[in-house]
């Protein structure tokens, strides 16, 4: 079994390095157009065989050329070969753009069978790890009644990814920095 160190950049490039050979480059692949609000933002994950990367590639400021390729990517960890790509559906109303965008920026979370990621548009996605098939999705960009009876609103899923603890999936929703969809809720889903 080979040790591999993965890195991602806002340029849209992902890298595999050999830590046993002073960081020798094993492969590099560009999966996003990159730019100020593009590429890899907060973190990737692995299942010790494949690399899973979130690509933001938002058109937030329209300063970078090229076609955006937002989504979740699965790459073979040893070769960089694309296993699958999940492209979110654009559900943003024109009056919500550019704050609402289908880019996936938050760190991804992996379990034995699943990849979990969330988007600038507030949608949370649960995918089959092996095929990339969408298994479940939930819109967090809505109003919620908190336990204390106070109204709260979700928004963009950004920065930290989902946390799995026992039978619970925790995710924060709402991230105003950079003109995204503000809000502030911590959601707890029961996982079967």
Language model features: what each stretch is:
Residues 1-104, 109-159, 163-192:
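Extracytoplasmic/lumenal domain signature
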